[in-house]
């Protein structure tokens, strides 16, 4: 997320890149207002079209709209900021992030929640971290294809369960 202020409120903006001009929708209120981008008026040079049809809805991956190289820089910055609390000279000790060969379908583990609503009973997906609603996904772009396949096989057959995990070999 990136932060913004509006009428004295601090906003955590998901789906935006620092410096962009965007329209947002407030989806939750904690100490800050939690917002999702609904329209990009002036995009950042590192913005890309993400592949995920559930982007921002499931709240799982938050960088899919950013070029991969920039994602690595952002993630390195997050790690540095956390570690600076413990070591003021951390900048000199952290190497560059080693990029992965795979930009998608790399995760080999997932934990899914199972729907208890009558309409979707036994189907599974992810819980949105802000709305706490189950998002029934059709496919997760960052999950290994074996996980997507197994989740689809199990769909509709999970009555009585609340969660389950899948882990697959990547070989």
Identify the meaning behind each predicted range.
Residues 1-171:
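Accessory RNA-recognition modules of RNA-modification enzymes
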């Amino acid at each position: 997320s990136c932060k913004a202020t509006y009428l004295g409120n601090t906003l955590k903006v998901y789906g935006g890149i620092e410096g962009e001009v965007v329209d947002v929708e407030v989806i939750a209120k904690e100490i800050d207002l939690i917002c999702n981008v609904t329209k990009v008026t002036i995009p950042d040079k590192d913005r890309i079209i993400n592949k995920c049809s559930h982007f921002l809805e499931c709240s799982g991956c938050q960088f899919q709209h950013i070029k991969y190289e920039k994602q690595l820089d952002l993630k390195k910055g997050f790690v540095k900021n956390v570690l600076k609390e413990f070591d003021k000279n951390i900048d000199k000790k952290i190497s560059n992030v080693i990029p992965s060969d795979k930009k998608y379908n790399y995760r080999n583990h997932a934990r899914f929640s199972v729907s208890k609503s009558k309409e979707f009973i036994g189907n599974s997906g992810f819980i949105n971290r802000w709305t706490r609603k189950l998002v029934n996904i059709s496919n997760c772009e960052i999950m290994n294809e074996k996980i997507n396949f197994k989740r689809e096989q199990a769909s509709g057959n999970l009555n009585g369960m609340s969660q389950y995990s899948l882990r697959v070999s990547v070989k």
